[in-house]
Amino acid sequence: MPSNSKRSMAPPTNVSKQISATSTSKKAPTKPTTQNSIAGAKSTGSPETRTSSPEHMESPETPTATTTVNRKKQKRRQKQAARLAAERQSSNMPAQNGDGGHDIVADFSRAATQGQHAAFDNDDLDYTDDETHYSTQGQRGLQHDKNGVLHQSQEPSKRKGKKKKNRKSRSQSHQAEGSSTSMSTPSASLARPVTLPPLSSSAYRSAHKVTKDRIWNTSTHEERERIKEFWLQLGEEERRSLVKVEKEAVLRKMKEQQKHSCSCTVCGRKRTAIEEELEVLYDAYYEELEQYANHKQGSFENGAPIGAPPRLYQPPLRTLDRHSHHPVAQHPSRGRVQELPDDDEDLDDDYDEDDEDDEPYSEDELEDAARTTRADFFAFGNSLTVKDGILTVADDLLKNDGKHFIDMMEQLAERRMQREEDTQYAAASAAHQSMHAGHNHGPPLDEEEYDDEEEEDYDSQDDEEYEEDEMDAMTEEQRMEEGRRMFQIFAARMFEQRVLTAYREKIARERQERLIEELEEENRLDVEREAKKAREAQKRKDKKKLQKQAKEEERAKREAERAAEEAAQKALEEKRLEEQRRKKEEQRKKREAEKKAQEEERQRKEAERQKRLKEERERQAEFERKQREQKEREKKKREEAKKREREEKEAKERELREKKIKEERERREREEKARQEKEAAAKAERESREKAKREEQAAQQAAAQAAAVQAAKRASQSGPTHLPPGLQHPQGPSALQSPHFQVATPVVPKAPTPIRPRQPSQQGSHASSPRSQPAHVDISQTSSLSPGSVSTTIPGKGVSQAPLLHHPQPSAPLSPLGGVGRGSHTLGFSPMQSLNGLPTNPGTIPAMGPRMPMAHDMSMYTNHSGPLGGQYRGFASPDSIPLPPGITGPRHLGQGRGFQMEVGHTSLPFHPQPNAAGPISAAAPQSSQNSGASLTHTRQPSISFERNQHETQPQSQPISRPAPIQRPASTVPHDQHKDESKTNQQEIDELSTQLGSSALLDDSDIPLTAPPSQPLSSALPPGLPGAGRIGFAGPSLFSDHLGSSKPHFSLGAPGSGAGWAHNPFGSPGFPAAPSWGPSSGAGWPTNAFGILGGSHRAHTSRPVAIRLSVIQACKQLNTTSGTDSSGYHNVNQILRQVEQLNSPNESQIGLDEMLDICDTEGNPQNGGGSFIIKNEGPKGTFVKFEPDNNSISSSTRGSVVPGDIGSPVPGSSLPTPGSGSRQFATTNISPTTGF
């Protein structure tokens, strides 16, 4: 091992190196750049600058050196130093690279005179010595080619003048060295940093169109500025990633190169040492690079160049050829790193520039320099190329896939291993030689040619004249430091490649974005251009259109002028054309004759065609008629099937009804028997009371006779006085008999009016109406009601007042009961506490019982519009105050003398106690005896009220046949009474049909005799008395007196077992109630209230009910739609109307079911008429109802349209209690049969 004393020889070497580098940096002015740039320097210095290359290839020795020194090189260095000193003195310009070159020259002067290490004691000076040259000079000649690869921008004028010398120098170098691996010939496997993919030619063509844009400007200065800005914009993490990406790549490359190397232990240790050395070197390099980046940030922003990071060590760098026995002191060439492009053309241009560099030296000197560089890998002599006075080191490391770099790292590993062994063995030099003699093999090289040339170089070195020169061997530490320095140069080179690659990627992205924007701009311009062309074309069209219009107007004007001229000419030629007209007239007549003949022929053909069409229509009509007849036959078949089904159903119902009637008859017989027994007991009691009454009457008659005597005396003096019919004296005992049951309810007195009321007729009044009543009742009948009969009910009240002999209204006859019950205050009577034992409600009308319980707690009085008490005739309002017209609630019931209530308009069914004493029970025997004698022979009341059109009882009929005298109901058998009532009813109906609206018929009108014209009562099944269609409106033509008995509805005495019917309000009548008195057979009419709330179609089959509802819905829609309607209605609208008419408790009707029923043929049972169904596709299906003779609209009951003859007055309908949505409707379409 050489001792450390040999280090004293290093300063001159470094000083000379610095002189060379300083002179190079001064003579070759460069611009500031960043460390992102790549070495591609362009020299502009003088020929003296090129002398640095030979100087760097040799290492001078001081005179005190023990080894021999190459005198030629020493002389050359002395000459170069003298020239540099002269140039420094003559140069007044400061260094332009900003790397402290002036300080380096000063330090070199001091080092030359003093022989010290001043230049190497300053890190900054040492940094600016190599890396600054490398980084600052690298970007001067950079330009991008079309593929994104940098190349040197050479001046064309220099290339032509330098080609010859460059080729000559290159041939001499080949002859001297015999190597193909120098930097003059690039390897095929040159390791280069990753570059961006080339842009397309179209992109570059579009890029060259906008050369003024900054993105496409490729000038070196602006590009360096952009690289600087790019580096400043990078964050800490991005910078770190750019730096640290090299370590793994180098290690991976090392492993790939050493795959086929020796597998001995020494080589394995060597590989491990190489990896460890790389780890240490990269870690130190990364740390210093980060520190330097942070330290140089300010100078970078101010425009100062950024070079490689400061070196870890700055010892004097000397090389020692360990493979040669003749060591020669060599100095590793250092300078700015320069990138060599891949293409051969650029390489030739580089060599053109190199011609100028070799001028100051002779060919022999270059050959000597080439030979001396083969001594050791650390000398890098065989791979260094002179480029404008700049030695490329990193390019050599990249050649041959980094083989030189790997060799360098192996050398470092060997040195490291040697140091480890030297610590163990003292003999450093001998051990070193012996160890490497046995293991002097490295990884196989990729190119055999290179190996051969290397061996030739080494062999030639042994035979050269340098054998006599002794190289001063460097210490191991110096060799290691030199290797580290070379590694730093390599790492800086690779780092710059990474930064430049990132910058190129950014520029490529920006260019691509700009290209996209330009393409979009071109597209937009194309669209605008097309739109502009379209507008211009439209303008041209409009212009042509205007021109054409102007031409048309001008042409029309010319034609008008021409027409005027022609008219003038025609006027002139009129005479000339007269003869021609005559000729034409003859010809025209001839043509007309021909035309007439043709017309006749055409008419004949047309007649034939019409005839054929008519026959075709007839055939079509016949076909349609047959189809219609077939359809009608099918309908008839269906109707017959339905009719048979209905008849079977009716037969079953009839049998069921007959069974019920039989059971009811047996029950009634039992009840009648029980009632007769009760009546016998009541008769005995009544006889005892009548005996007491007769005794009292005898006393009263005595007093009355006395008064009559006095009155006769006064009458004989004053003459006879005419009394009203109501106050005449009874003619005999028969006058006390009443044909009706006497109800103890006073008649509501009429309000006095200023005009004279109509005097009731006394002649023929008994025969004027079937329902007329006796015109007068003897006053003595009133006297028959003794106060004693009332005293049992009203104890403590005196009733011995004289009978009222003057009626408030002379024309109105008195009630048969006289003043009893006319008012609670008129005769001093207090309000009746009970009626035959029934308790009365306080505050209600006198002599009226409390509300009776009804089914489902239903209200007895519906729709009260006035105070209770004025609703019914014979029940006076409180204090006998008459109610004004129109505020009487339900209509007043027309009722005659004797309180005969009309069936169907009767008042409340009372339940009197059987043994209660009262004024009504006193007259019970007489009413029970003669009730059937004059039942219907009563006077029609003078008052009138609006009656429903469906009630068949004539109102105020002036002419009517009186009913025949009948036996009392109690003595007439049930069947006989029913037959007589039916006969009487038919006679009355015959009489009624000749009056009313029938009298308005014309002689030509055919009266309809369809079953709907029959009274409603005839449609009821046997056993059901006639029921009115509205509550309290039973048929009034039934002459049922109060004692008549009907099955299911007799009102017998208490305990008779009479109860409600099967349907409380669905069938006529109320439950049987005890009679007013003990008389047998006495009771309310069986259908006192008629059908209360029940549906009038309770027993109608569902198809018939649905058809009737559809008919009614069509009529209502016709009424609401007006006269312009065609009568067709949408089926959905009809269905909604039918649902409104139906009761909620009825089952839902479907659309298909309704349409099927509309296809059925009409008959008197289902409403008649026919339906026309029309299907209009998307509009829907429409139905029209056409009535016929069987339809309800042509019956005597009329239609439901207000205003027709026989239609009800809208305010005359009385609602009836009960369930169902149609209980208040004037339903007149129910069939009389078909239950």
UniProtKB/Swiss-Prot annotation:
Q: Where is the composition biased (Low complexity)?
A: 20-34, 179-189, 426-437, 698-715, 1206-1221
Keywords for this entry?
Coiled coil, Cytoplasm, Stress response
Coiled coil start-end: 502-714
Q: Where is this region: Disordered?
A: 1-210, 300-369, 416-480, 517-848, 904-987, 1001-1023, 1186-1235
Composition skew (Basic and acidic residues), residue ranges: 517-539, 549-697
> Compositional bias (Basic residues) spans?
70-80, 159-171
Give the chief site where it resides. Answer: cytoplasm
A GO cellular component entry from the record: cytoplasm
* Subcellular localization(s) per the UniProt record: Cytoplasm
Q: Where is the composition biased (Polar residues)?
A: 1-19, 35-52, 759-772, 779-794, 831-843, 924-959, 1188-1198, 1222-1235
Q: What does this protein do, in the record's words?
A: May act as a negative regulator of salt tolerance.
- Recorded protein name is Stress response protein NST1
Species: Coccidioides immitis (strain RS)
